Design a protein with these regions (language model features):
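Cys/His-rich zinc-coordinating "finger/knuckle" motifs
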Residues: 40, 46, 55-58, 100-106, ...
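C-type cytochrome heme c attachment motif
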Residues: 32-35, 47-50, 92-102
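Iron-sulfur-cluster electron-transfer modules
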Residues: 77-158
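Generic long, charged, amphipathic alpha-helical segments
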Residues: 55, 59-86
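Flexible inter-domain linker/hinge segments
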Residues: 1-49, 55-56, 63, 68-69, ...
Length: 158
């Protein structure tokens, strides 16, 4: 455990979707962030593009890890873990994995975000855009069939 984390530190457990064995659980993945702030680079490297654009701590890998850690450790109520506010903290993460390659602790915020989103959408509506992308194969088959006739008629009439 990181020296910055108090001995009495305990986390709320929940059913994890991904395999976090190497990280010693989801909490362990968050605890990899030791607060050094390499994710706050602005002049070189790719990490973290959303922080580089906003210069706001909450949009750095460290800020996101701290927010999630606060929710699962009891510093914030656990329901904050799947709140709209937490969604906004993670929303600008591009899932580019620069944090995993450039962070000295190899924090994988993309994987952390995927776990968060899975839990978030258990209690929130999945956006239409996400549903459409998840079902793009069905949409493509429709557009190649019925809709292609309609599109051809429209194109020929112009």
């Amino acid at each position: 455990m990181c020296a910055l984390i108090p001995q009495k530190y305990k986390t709320t457990t929940f059913e994890e979707t991904f395999d976090w064995t190497q990280e010693n659980g989801f909490a362990g993945a968050l605890e990899k962030c030791n607060g050094v702030g390499a994710c706050r680079k602005v002049k070189e490297g790719a990490m973290c593009p959303s922080y580089q654009a906003t210069l706001e701590e909450e949009h750095s890998t460290r800020g996101r890890a701290n927010a999630l850690r606060a929710a699962i450790s009891g510093s914030l109520p656990f329901n904050e873990f799947s709140s709209e506010r937490m969604y906004k903290v993670l929303d600008l993460c591009l899932e580019c994995k620069s944090c995993k390659s450039e962070c000295p602790s190899n924090v994988d915020m993309a994987k952390i975000k995927y776990e968060f989103l899975h839990n978030y959408y258990l209690s929130h509506k999945v956006p239409l855009r996400s549903k459409m992308i998840a079902n793009i194969h069905k949409i493509n088959s429709l557009s190649a069939g019925i809709f292609s006739v309609v599109v051809n008629i429209i194109v020929r009439s112009q």
